[in-house]
Amino acid sequence: MTRLLIAASGTGGHLFPALAVAEAVEDLWLVSWVGVPDRLETQLVPERFGLVCVNAGGLQGRGLKKLLQLLRLLLASVSVRRAIRRNAIDAVFTTGGYIAAPAILAARWCCIPVVLHESNAIPGRVTRLLGRFCSAVAIGLPAAAKRIPGSQPVLTGTPVRSSFLTPQPLPSWVPHGAGPLLVVMGGSQGAVGLNRMVRAAVPTLLQQGCRVVHLTGDNDPDIEQLQHPQLVERRFSDEIPGLLQHADLAISRAGAGSISELAVCCTPAVLVPFPQAADQHQEANAACAASLGAAVIVHQHEPEQPVLLSTVQRLLAVKLEQPDSASDPLAQMREGMQALAERDAERQLAALLQTLVK
């Protein structure tokens, strides 16, 4: 049986695509997992994948700090190599981030194929530095193709969990009514700035007849301060596929994973890029969706309540039965999301891995 080591760690943007690939191959392949201690993978990776954690970090800084980081990278690579040898691994799959560097180096050390998947339009530092040493590089968005030196990336899209690809019911706790459903998502790390923007606009939208589901993330001190029968605030939900499939409009950060989930659900979106994202990659991700007419971009530094509120009102004008609404822009946005979607990304990646295993 072919043995695959997955190296994915940190945020949902790295973990969820890797989990989708693991689910796609586990009937035919034996899957193991390597991550970093005290990160999200310790909660999300199923026990059957036998998570092994190694200490890995970034390569920022200069002088002594850089030397210490290089030493830690070497030690992490040795640990991953040990896991490869112990489990007789045939191939490595990684989604970037801190754990990707030792995984790529260890795979090269052991002379086994390694596939790197980059979800973002602007590749991360590890992808830019080490993509040339991988057996294959796959990308989620076309804009990344010319930004990975020394490689010829394959466009596969970004994998999503299987529940996004099959019809899901609307969660029973969603407010009932005839008004349009607006779903707000801050991502796996939450979004304080986005929450503030949304809360400034929500009272008016509720007054006009919207139903609102707001997933705030863990670090939100103001949850449930606003009470309304058509508003539900939760820190997290494991029923996001059902929410997005039934939503009329979503407000979201512009992580590549979130955009991929919106796309396969054909959910029109207002994207608010995280302004501190590395290399402004969320801005570039949002631009890819907006170029297809699938999304509208609102920036966090813009006057918060008027811009976001007016954008949502314009997009929902027909459903809110506003008298000056002429046509429904949501239909065209759904078509844009459908054009952006890659519904078989995990199968494409599984096939790519299979071609590389001798």
Swiss-Prot record:
It holds the Pfam family Glyco_transf_28. One of its GO terms (molecular function) is UDP-N-acetyl-D-glucosamine:N-acetylmuramoyl-L-alanyl-D-glutamyl-meso-2,6-diaminopimelyl-D-alanyl-D-alanine-diphosphoundecaprenol 4-beta-N-acetylglucosaminlytransferase activity. InterPro entries: GlcNAc_MurG (IPR006009), Glyco_trans_28_C (IPR007235), GlycoTrans_28_N (IPR004276). Pathway: Cell wall biogenesis; peptidoglycan biosynthesis. Coiled coil: none annotated. It is found in: Cell inner membrane. The keyword Aminoacyl-tRNA synthetase does not apply. It catalyses: di-trans,octa-cis-undecaprenyl diphospho-N-acetyl-alpha-D-muramoyl-L-alanyl-D-glutamyl-meso-2,6-diaminopimeloyl-D-alanyl-D-alanine + UDP-N-acetyl-alpha-D-glucosamine = di-trans,octa-cis-undecaprenyl diphospho-[N-acetyl-alpha-D-glucosaminyl-(1->4)]-N-acetyl-alpha-D-muramoyl-L-alanyl-D-glutamyl-meso-2,6-diaminopimeloyl-D-alanyl-D-alanine + UDP + H(+). GO terms for cellular component: plasma membrane. The keyword Cell membrane applies. It is a peripheral membrane protein. GO terms for biological process: carbohydrate metabolic process; cell division; cell wall organization; lipid glycosylation; peptidoglycan biosynthetic process; regulation of cell shape. UDP-N-acetyl-alpha-D-glucosamine binds at residues 11-13, 120, 161, 188, 282. Its EC number is 2.4.1.227. Keywords: Cell cycle, Cell division, Cell inner membrane, Cell membrane, Cell shape, Cell wall biogenesis/degradation, Glycosyltransferase, Membrane, Peptidoglycan synthesis, Transferase. Belongs to the glycosyltransferase 28 family. MurG subfamily. Cell wall formation. Catalyzes the transfer of a GlcNAc subunit on undecaprenyl-pyrophosphoryl-MurNAc-pentapeptide (lipid intermediate I) to form undecaprenyl-pyrophosphoryl-MurNAc-(pentapeptide)GlcNAc (lipid intermediate II). This is UDP-N-acetylglucosamine--N-acetylmuramyl-(pentapeptide) pyrophosphoryl-undecaprenol N-acetylglucosamine transferase. The gene is murG.
